[in-house]
Amino acid sequence: MNNSINHKFHHISRAEYQELLAVSRGDAVADYIIDNVSILDLINAGEISGPIVIKGRYIAGVGAEYADTPALQRIDARGATAVPGFIDAHLHIESSMMTPVTFETATLPRGLTTVICDPHEIVNVMGEAGFAWFARCAEQARQNQYLQVSSCVPALEGCDVNGASFTLEQMLAWRDHPQVTGLAEMMDYPGVINGQNALLDKLDAFRYLTLDGHCPGLGGKELNAYIAAGIENCHESYQLEEGRRKLQLGMSLMIREGSAASNLNALAPLINEFNSPQCMLCTDDRNPWEIAHEGHIDALIRRLIEQHNVPLHVAYRVASWSTARHFGLNHLGLLAPGKQADIVLLSDARKVTVQQVLVKGEPIDAQTLQAEESARLALSAPPYGNTIARQPVSASDFALQFTPGKRYRVIDVIHNELITHSRSSVYSENGFDRDDVCFIAVLERYRQRLAPACGLLGGFGLNEGALAATVSHDSHNIVVIGRSAEEMALAVNQVIQDGGGLCVVRNGQVQSHLPLPIAGLMSTDTAQSLAEQIDALKAAARECGPLPDEPFIQMAFLSLPVIPALKLTSQGLFDGEKFAFTTLEVTE
């Protein structure tokens, strides 16, 4: 918890203080009073009866003693339960394929009043210009959009080709920006553990802010060393005992439930009354279809309550107060005097049924957000421009030669998990010894014109056709999987023609595609339109076989070398446990 930095985010003038205190004392008229409401007590459990009094952006008072306080406007909550606005502790907005403006429109009416985002997806493509655009969006947003400064661009030096660098000098230029809360996930955990000076320089430079971690499956002395370097949290835990050990060693635990990585069921049993201040909720990557049909942080709270019997005050605590404290955002996370009036009114607290949302003391109207979306997006000056330098490809670019009797490495996918296994498969004149093996390739899309890196993929469920995308963590080269070289080439050429995007090919034809004109990562369409297009893509993909629930998001992580065990980057097959490149043929 970084109380030392709270002053950076809690902007309130002396005049605002005087006005707030006057309303708190009962000597002045409030702006809003929320009547007929019960407030969920996140500290003591139970509920607090009485109105909530708001002046400007802040809560002036709470409780029955304010029943007769005059106000410019009164809101009848109709017996609703009030809770603090929800906070996502770690996400990449770009992975929703929405702009920050569209993301706000889609999630703010669901109670998501604050996000802590790492824009390293667009920074890997466009460098500092991408970070600057996110900062502009954050400055004009109603939603509290805070930024962690991207620390690993690319994710691992020397393992992939990305579009831009983000130097320490450039990072430092953003450190004191009012929307910056710290240093984003330090993914090169072997480098930190081994004391690489370039990484320690980054940690030292952001030491007084929050230092985000990334260490899937790490334990023993290595975990101790990583934490000793100053890393404060991790969102990559996927096993119960792994999460427990990190909590024991002083790390804060971000429990992630995204579109590809589903760790809530594994980690929810850890949450209790005692450790909940050290537990937070995050999505990391969640697509617009899931947001529209299931929700965002509201969906995670619902599952904690309904499926894991987490007490109400604890479930809402880890969705708000715990995260606010961790990032030094002490003006957020509680419904109490002096706190920012980010309030979610729930008609049913157990089902997380959102009735109304207020942020910074103002009621949110979903229709107004939608009506203003285009104008607000234009005001942010999005960084348009084609970032795909790759020329069209042909089937011969994906030709691989196999020798009968030889054994070859296969990236073995685990549905709805980011980690993969490494297995081997024997080739014969009739093909591989398991029929789930298909082809995967990664094509550098920026400047070096590297030949496609090709490999084998198992367990994905692709029985026919091909899928291609320019969303491919973290360097966002073109990734394609397929059963035939011809269909792989067709899918790749479609996303090149679109200037970036997603594509499904089957029966030798493009069945569905989605252009992503901003950095090959984001659409400028509305959230509703984007959700419908995602629905069409998923429907087309399902015709190709029993794929993961979110095939494109899962596919996007097959090239991320900092998550074990076997991945494919633009430079070849990478062993994520040894942190070294390996060969397609098994020769050991």
Swiss-Prot record:
GO terms for biological process: adenine catabolic process. CDD domains: AdeC (cd01295). It comes from the Bacteria. Its EC number is 3.5.4.2. Transmembrane segments: none annotated. Its cofactor is Mn(2+). SUPFAM superfamilies: Composite domain of metallo-dependent hydrolases (SSF51338), Metallo-dependent hydrolases (SSF51556). GO terms for molecular function: adenine deaminase activity. It catalyses: adenine + H2O + H(+) = hypoxanthine + NH4(+). InterPro entries: Adenine_deam, Adenine_deam_C, Amidohydro-rel, Metal-dep_hydrolase_composite, Metal_Hydrolase. The keyword Signal does not apply. The keyword Oxidoreductase does not apply. Belongs to the metallo-dependent hydrolases superfamily. Adenine deaminase family. Homodimer. This is Adenine deaminase. It comes from Shigella flexneri serotype 5b (strain 8401). The gene is ade.
